[in-house]
Amino acid sequence: MAERTACVERNTLETRIKVSVNLDGTGKTRFATGVPFFEHMLDQIARHGLIDLDIECQGDLHIDDHHTVEDVGITLGQAFARAIGDKKGIVRYGHSYVPLDEALSRVVVDFSGRPGLSMQVPYTRARVGSFDVDLFQEFFQGFVNHAQVTLHIDNLRGSNTHHQIETVFKAFGRALRMAVEPDPRMVGQTPSTKGCL
């Protein structure tokens, strides 16, 4: 099987970003975004998805974290789309439930070519440290739009906001791993009755 890797650069007046991914990696990471809690969550995607991630971003953090978080989502989505290619031979669908103490989240993803996000996370507070948790909606929307996936995220229970978010990102990584995994019974075939995705 060909290497499923990609490197994407995206430069705007708000951010300068470079993202490299290896879908068949071991969870190696290197991050330089200037947003530590965000990097902690990106690490969950890589470690639990066994996806190598290298992400650099110079953003307008003097304003706030919004553009950095959203634009990393966009660029990561573009990198996934490029790395996965025509989607032949993949499982396509992935899902995961992940607990952390009192918190439990479920994530379901479909590499359908149809971007859509349903995200239900009733955060118990607005910030973790200085990080605005609403920005994770922007991250996932950016990813969904540019990876061309359908993504359902549900935090089923939890009272600690850090735990709620961490279970979401761990489940997201595991769902991605399942969806992009090569299916030995679908070699060379598109996992759709339409014949294309």
Swiss-Prot record:
Q: Which GO terms describe its biological process?
A: L-histidine biosynthetic process
Name the PROSITE patterns on file.
IGP_DEHYDRATASE_1 (PS00954), IGP_DEHYDRATASE_2 (PS00955)
* Gene label: hisB
Q: Write out the entry's keywords from A to Z.
A: Amino-acid biosynthesis, Cytoplasm, Histidine biosynthesis, Lyase
Instruction: Give the Gene Ontology MF terms in alphabetical order.
Output: imidazoleglycerol-phosphate dehydratase activity
Q: Which reaction does this enzyme catalyse, per its entry?
A: D-erythro-1-(imidazol-4-yl)glycerol 3-phosphate = 3-(imidazol-4-yl)-2-oxopropyl phosphate + H2O
Q: What EC number(s) would the UniProt record show?
A: 4.2.1.19
Name of the protein in its database record: Imidazoleglycerol-phosphate dehydratase
Q: Name one Pfam family in it.
A: IGPD
Q: Which HAMAP family match?
A: HisB (MF_00076)
